[in-house]
Structure formats: structure tokens, C-alpha cells
Amino acid sequence: MAEGVFQGAIGIDLGTTYSCVATYESSVEIIANEQGNRVTPSFVAFTPEERLIGDAAKNQAALNPENTVFDAKRLIGRRFDDESVQKDRKTWPFKLIDVEGNPVVEVQYLGETKTFSPQEISSMVLTKMKEIAEAKIGQKVEKAVITVPAYFNDAQRQATKDAGSISGLNVLRIINEPTAAAIAYGLGAGKSEKERHVLIFDLGGGTFDVSLLHIAGGVYTVKSTSGNTHLGGQDFDTNMLEHFKNEFKKKTGNDISGDARALRRLRTACERAKRTLSSVTQTTIEVDSLYNGDDFETSITRARFEDLNSSLFKSTLEPVEQVLKDAKVPKTEIDEVVLVGGSTRIPKVQKMLSDFFEGKQLEKSINPDEAVAYGAAVQGAILTGQSTSEDTKDLLLLDVAPLSLGVGMQGDIFGIVVPRNTTVPTIKRRTFTTVADHQSTVQFPVYQGERVNCKENTLLGEFDLKNIPPMQAGEPVLEAIFEVDANGILKVTAVEKSTGKSANITISNAVGRLSSDEIEKMVNQAEEFKAADEAFAKKHEARQRLESYVASIEQQVTDPVLSSKLKRGSKTKIESALSDALASLEIQDASTDDLRKAEVGLKRVVTKAMSSR
């Protein structure tokens, strides 16, 4: 890599199933990985020898299911007892354990049992994306804009930001995926002049968002947003997997539910079939020796696939109705409906959406897999002063808080301070008071959600305002000040007005969050793992080099023409050096140095023998 630090910021779409990275150097470029793929699987695998990330991890998933981790985005910022975590846990082959209420992955790595938080797994994927960018740019990358689903709550946003910190990135901004996609769309040819309402329909591998934007002369104003942080292509695959699992059981009497390897192989076949069914109406599924030596061969039609997922497909229209209602915009006033996310390639999803908008032509001008990273790279260029084009120079993003924020009041009633769809950054205030005479302390539990009953919303954290002067109930004036920054992350302050006493909480230290010490520890661990990966790669390279050199010398020694030209005694010396080199190769844990020494030793003997011919 060339010296120096990249002055801009890369844009990373950290996806549930696949991630994508883009950079802006005079224009946006989506960067392909070492396999030439423009999207990289969000998979991390652990083996007795090494750690694999991306394509290499996904490719060996069937052989090593218990130690191949994916879907970290479905865990990040969630509690272990979260309903969706418990449901997903039944389908994941890797082990999930409860550590102080937080979900943690347990794997076997380098011969030891190791545990990793979802933030650490996500940071490994982010590190991979950073390395892909560095290989292309030729400079060290330090800054990034990372995207999250618009419907991510405060905990999920902060945890994603923490993952960026663990990977050694300075996360300049967390931006919403549909908003990033809207930038990619808005910067398309000749689109930036006219004022219009654009609905972004973003259905990915694991999450679903709908955002309604008003775009006018470079100003992107999000009017409303809705979605489901647990709906996407993975769920469609799961429904197909269940269907075929039952079919295989009927055909063979074998239940593969407990076999992680068979399930992974069948899931991969389902994912492939799902993609194929977007362009043809029928496809076959073939898995050799799926279980107990039984092959599985079957077919599925597009209609059957649609039937298996009909309720999920229908559920995607609810957030569409919600955003129109919240923004008070009738569907006839939507100028464009833009498709984002790989799952929008499904014909049924497109048809339902088009029908909802009275047969409207859907906008497919942007690549659904790459649009989010594209928009993030543009935002990165703007934030680092690297954007040079006329289009991006005046670009302004006005996003919203996806869920209401407030405090718990007496009787567990939710007192909203920041209503959902409020433009961020924002500062909102609301006054409260005491409920008992001479009450000196008031607890402020901070919640996020839309339910009247606090228990049905997400508790983000709590703090106490102490030393309130003794007064009658209802007399003190307590002001709660909610500040939401451009990342959608919250800071709350409470002030007792007569004394000016205050207490505050940045929700980053709430339940299930990482402290700065924990992040620092994870950063150091990440560097150790990276060093271990590099050491393993060097050792692997040294072994391969020695193996190929040994093979070429063996060929020369056994070739009658070449060996006849060797000086008497030289052949014996070469054969002896060859057996020493082979002995080094047979030592499983031979160090890189030992392998290099063996290669140098063999070369010395060969060179001497050849030169004295």
C-alpha cells in the first residue's frame, strides 16, 4: 500500500447478508473485493488455524457451520431476551449465549473457546470493507460513513457506531439506508432540478425500510419513515427451507432439523433458487447426499414460492401506507417509487407495489445492491470537503427520528418529548413535576417507541435528578431536554428550574452498551486478531512456496536428462536437502521462519550443485 492517509471518507453499507463499500474521488466508485465481487458476504468464520471474512467465510459455511457467524445485524443493539433474537436463535447453527442480558456468540477459534459481541463480529466485516477500499485507493483509510436501516432504534445505532470504532474507523456519520439510496437516485441524470416526492422502498437481506422524501434543488427532506428491522430475503429463504425440509422428510423419512451442515447446504440451494425465480417461472433444487447418503432433487415454481411468502410480501405494504399517512401525502402525489435492496428484484414484490400505486411504473435506474453505499460515499465526500461536483456541492440532507423518544411517567405512561418523524438534529423540551410532597429525587427512565404503556417500548436508559428543594407535590418545574444528533443518537438532560441543578445521560452508556474501556479493549483485540491473520497468511504463503519449489526440484532430480548432467555426488546432496525440506513440511505447526529457512537451505544446495555442473 502506498504511504499516506486517504483524505476522504469511504461509504459502507453494512448489510445483514451482504456489505458494499464505495469511495468518492471526483466521482463515486463501488469497489470490488479480491474475488471481483462488488458485494461481500457479511460472514465471519473461525477455524483452528485462522479467521475468514466475506466470501471465504461463506464458502466454507457448510463444512464449519457452528463456527461461521452471520446475521450479526439481527443481533446488534438487541437484548438476549428480545423476541426476535430468541426466534432467530433456533435457526442459527452457531451458539448464542447470554452475558449480562446481551447476546454473545461463542465459537471455537485457534483451539480455544472464544466469545464475541455482535459489535465485534460487525467490526470484523467493517475491517474487511475498509481493507477492500485500501487495496483500491492505495492509502490508509481512517474515516467512514456507515449506513443503518432507517427504523433502527437508538441502541442499534450506537452499537453500529461502536462496531466502527472497534474496526479502527472514525465514523463521521451514521446515515439511514433509504436516505443514502435517495442521494444515489437523486444524483442520477437530470433528476436534481425538479421538485418531487420520492418513496424509497428498501427491502434487503434482513431489514425493510420505507422512507418518503421531498427532493428539491439538492435539499433532501425526509418527511416520514417506517419499516421492520426484521424482514428480508433471509426470511423468504427460511420459509422455502421449511417447505423443503418437510418434503425431504416425506420422501426419505429423515428429519434434518438437527443437522447444521445439511441445513446450511439446503439454505444455500434455497437462496440460489429464490434468485433464479426472479427471472424464470420454475427451477430445480439439487443437493447431493443431503443427509444419510440420500440425495435431494425437487423443483419449485415461482407461484409456489410466492404462496410460501404471501403473508410476508403483503406485510411490506403496511409501512408504505404508514409513511403516506404520517407525511399526509396522498399516493397520487408520489412522483417516483424507487426500489432498493436485493429482495426488490422479486417480481411479486414489484407487482404488489406497482398495483398499490395504481399500476405506476417503478423506478429501477439505480443498482439495488449498490445504491446505499453510493449515497454513503457521497455523504462522506461532503463531510470531508472532498466533493467537487456541482450536484453534490449544495446537497443537504434533512433526516428524521424514526421512533418517538420520551420519558416514563407515573403509571408507566409514556410521555413523548420527541415525536417520531421529527427532523434531526433537534432539541426538544418538556416539563414534568413531582408526584409526592417534599420529593427530593426524580427518576427519568428514557424510552423509545410508539406505545402508551412504557413496558411495550424500548428502555434506552435511566438517570436520577437529585437534591430537588423540598416543595409540595406538583410545585417543582423539572425540564427534560432531549438532544438528538445527526446520527439519530440521543442525549438527555433534566434540569430543576429554581436551582438550575441538572443531571444528564448520553444514551451510549445505557443497558447493553459498550463503555469506552470495553471499546478500547475490543480495538486492541481486533488488532491482535488482524496480526494473527497476517501471520497465518505469511506462514501459508511460505509453506506453499516451499511445496512448489520442492516439487520442481523433485521433477528435475527424477528427470533422467537433467539428473545426468549433475556432478557426481551432487544428486545425493540434493536428495538429502529435499528430505530435510519435506520433513519441515510435515511439521504441522512449523513456523514461517522454519519454512523459509528450509527453502533457503534447499536453494543453496541446488544452486551449488547446478553451478558446479
Swiss-Prot record:
<dbReference type="GO" id="GO:0140662">
    <property type="term" value="F:ATP-dependent protein folding chaperone"/>
</dbReference>
<feature type="region of interest" description="Nucleotide binding domain (NBD)">
    <location>
        <begin position="1"/>
        <end position="391"/>
    </location>
</feature>
<dbReference type="InterPro" id="IPR043129">
    <property type="entry name" value="ATPase_NBD"/>
</dbReference>
<feature type="binding site">
    <location>
        <position position="73"/>
    </location>
    <ligand>
        <name>ATP</name>
    </ligand>
</feature>
<keyword id="KW-0143">Chaperone</keyword>
<dbReference type="GO" id="GO:0005524">
    <property type="term" value="F:ATP binding"/>
</dbReference>
<dbReference type="InterPro" id="IPR029048">
    <property type="entry name" value="HSP70_C_sf"/>
</dbReference>
<keyword id="KW-0378">Hydrolase</keyword>
<keyword id="KW-0963">Cytoplasm</keyword>
<dbReference type="GO" id="GO:0005737">
    <property type="term" value="C:cytoplasm"/>
</dbReference>
<dbReference type="InterPro" id="IPR013126">
    <property type="entry name" value="Hsp_70_fam"/>
</dbReference>
<keyword id="KW-0648">Protein biosynthesis</keyword>
<keyword id="KW-0067">ATP-binding</keyword>
<comment type="subunit">
    <text>Binds to ribosomes. Binds close to the ribosomal tunnel exit via contacts with both ribosomal proteins and rRNA. Directly interacts with nascent polypeptides. This interaction is dependent on the ribosome-associated complex (RAC). Interacts with SSE1. Interacts with FES1.</text>
</comment>
<keyword id="KW-0547">Nucleotide-binding</keyword>
<feature type="binding site">
    <location>
        <position position="342"/>
    </location>
    <ligand>
        <name>ATP</name>
    </ligand>
</feature>
<feature type="region of interest" description="Lid domain (SBDalpha)">
    <location>
        <begin position="516"/>
        <end position="612"/>
    </location>
</feature>
<feature type="binding site">
    <location>
        <begin position="16"/>
        <end position="18"/>
    </location>
    <ligand>
        <name>ATP</name>
    </ligand>
</feature>
<feature type="binding site">
    <location>
        <begin position="205"/>
        <end position="207"/>
    </location>
    <ligand>
        <name>ATP</name>
    </ligand>
</feature>
<dbReference type="InterPro" id="IPR029047">
    <property type="entry name" value="HSP70_peptide-bd_sf"/>
</dbReference>
<dbReference type="InterPro" id="IPR018181">
    <property type="entry name" value="Heat_shock_70_CS"/>
</dbReference>
<feature type="short sequence motif" description="Nuclear export signal">
    <location>
        <begin position="574"/>
        <end position="582"/>
    </location>
</feature>
<feature type="region of interest" description="Substrate binding domain (SBD)">
    <location>
        <begin position="403"/>
        <end position="613"/>
    </location>
</feature>
<feature type="region of interest" description="Inter-domain linker">
    <location>
        <begin position="392"/>
        <end position="402"/>
    </location>
</feature>
<dbReference type="Pfam" id="PF00012">
    <property type="entry name" value="HSP70"/>
</dbReference>
<comment type="function">
    <text>Ribosome-bound, Hsp70-type chaperone that assists in the cotranslational folding of newly synthesized proteins in the cytosol. Stimulates folding by interacting with nascent chains, binding to short, largely hydrophobic sequences exposed by unfolded proteins, thereby stabilizing longer, more slowly translated, and aggregation-prone nascent polypeptides and domains that cannot fold stably until fully synthesized. The Hsp70-protein substrate interaction depends on ATP-binding and on allosteric regulation between the NBD and the SBD.</text>
</comment>
<protein>
    <recommendedName>
        <fullName>Ribosome-associated molecular chaperone SSB1</fullName>
        <ecNumber>3.6.4.10</ecNumber>
    </recommendedName>
</protein>
<comment type="similarity">
    <text>Belongs to the heat shock protein 70 family. Ssb-type Hsp70 subfamily.</text>
</comment>
<dbReference type="GO" id="GO:0016887">
    <property type="term" value="F:ATP hydrolysis activity"/>
</dbReference>
<feature type="binding site">
    <location>
        <begin position="271"/>
        <end position="278"/>
    </location>
    <ligand>
        <name>ATP</name>
    </ligand>
</feature>
<dbReference type="GO" id="GO:0006412">
    <property type="term" value="P:translation"/>
</dbReference>
